[in-house]
Amino acid sequence: MAFLLHQARFYTTVNHLRDLPPTVQPEIAFAGRSNAGKSTAINVLCNQKRLAFASKTPGRTQHINYFSVGPAAEPVANLVDLPGYGYAEVPGAAKAHWEMLLSSYLATRSQLCGLILMMDSRRPLTDLDRRMIEWFVPTGKPIHTLLTKCDKLTRQESINALRNTQKGLDAYRDQGVKGKLTVQLFSALKRTGLDEAHELIESWLRPSVADEKSEPVAQ
């Protein structure tokens, strides 16, 4: 099956909730700390070099960027690139704006069907990552974590990062969280985990045509 994400193009940019497009197509949001490799991961997933742009100044991108996927005449879904978070030098007013924008979007956007959360595999589950999870889990929708830059880890370090992150996510389930919390290793450079991520994302967007033979991700 041709990957749906390979049919992606820029749609629109918004900076306020009131400007969110009145689309009916399902959305998948991509979130992560500044420098977690979010833009690079989106580009690799969509098989494009410059679809999502990384700011030259980390943490300064304050907009929500929409990318439509599927045939240009009749898009079937949207990918939503949320502002990176956690850069220490960002002014307080900007941080407050991001917090309002991100938390409100994640909690209230009815079209949103899941969250892809990027974490640097060398530093997973920071306090800000946990805040993102805690904003979203009340919706009951799934969160899938990509442990990015896993090519920088040894095999044993990768195993430990995956195991420890899954343990941290399991703690939310133990607290009664209903939505699925899954995790995998990912490297845009080595293309590690690319097919696995494709299959999961497309199963959210088009569950009726999801590949039934795909390997399950860690849960």
Swiss-Prot record:
The residues covered by the EngB-type G domain are 24-207
Residue positions annotated to bind Mg(2+) are: 39, 61
Cofactor dependence is on: Mg(2+)
Q: Which GO terms describe its cellular component?
A: cytosol
Q: Which GO terms describe its molecular function?
A: GTP binding; metal ion binding
- Keywords recorded for this protein, A-Z: Cell cycle, Cell division, GTP-binding, Magnesium, Metal-binding, Nucleotide-binding, Septation
Q: Enumerate the HAMAP family for this protein.
A: GTPase_EngB (MF_00321)
Q: Which PANTHER family match?
A: ENGB-TYPE G DOMAIN-CONTAINING PROTEIN (PTHR11649:SF13), MSS1/TRME-RELATED GTP-BINDING PROTEIN (PTHR11649)
UniProt protein name: Probable GTP-binding protein EngB
Q: Which organism is it from?
A: Burkholderia ambifaria (strain ATCC BAA-244 / DSM 16087 / CCUG 44356 / LMG 19182 / AMMD)
Primary gene name: engB
